[in-house]
């Protein structure tokens, strides 16, 4: 919601077109369409396999479709921007750089003349952005997408670029920060692989991946991020997943 929540309001208020990536536009329309709808059984199966309790499943059902209720309606048409495009804003040229993993097609804007990077959530100074799997694509591997995007960003922007993030203050040291993020996730994957010496559910791996307490307010995000790490290990051929009595176990 913090990506797109006021886009519809701005477009209507100032009579301007919405410019964004195709996949993110369609994904937002899809999420907004869930408002008022019943929870798909695939979604319930997804979180049941992950090991959520009946109380947590009930909590998810009660919150299902909230996205559309907290954003302004998106325009029914938009102008697509994609990786490699160069767009003009107030007479300055900005290169569009795609990042994947946090969203499907996150667009950063880089001005070579100003040496500025509007990084959105693709590069933050303190925290790492959420990289999670959702019920609509349960076998997705967004973490490898995220890591590849970080590596590509190192090649596309200079080390001394001034980064304007979506959260936190502007900062310098883009390459160093990107390498820190990559190393953080690779270390988490190594720890997780060791932890899976015996079969574990998705919810069992929270202590390996998260320092903060997981409660009713963040367990869905934690579950999605845990599955992202597990799916990454599966795709790398390092762990396997087996279903036993509707619960998924990883080892």
Q: Which residue ranges define each predicted feature?
A:
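C-terminal regulatory/interaction regions
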Residues: 190-251
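Short hydrophobic/aromatic-enriched beta-strand-loop microsegments
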Residues: 15-20, 118-120, 181, 216
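Residue-level signal for the nucleotide or nucleotide-sugar donor/cofactor binding architecture
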Residues: 5, 141, 221
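Short, contiguous alpha-helical
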Residues: 12, 99, 234
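Aromatic/hydrophobic pocket-lining residues that form the small-molecule binding cavity
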Residues: 4, 146, 150, 226
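Active-site HxH/HxHxD metal-binding segment of metal-dependent hydrolases
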Residues: 1-87, 115
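Metallo-beta-lactamase
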Residues: 67-78, 86, 93-189, 202
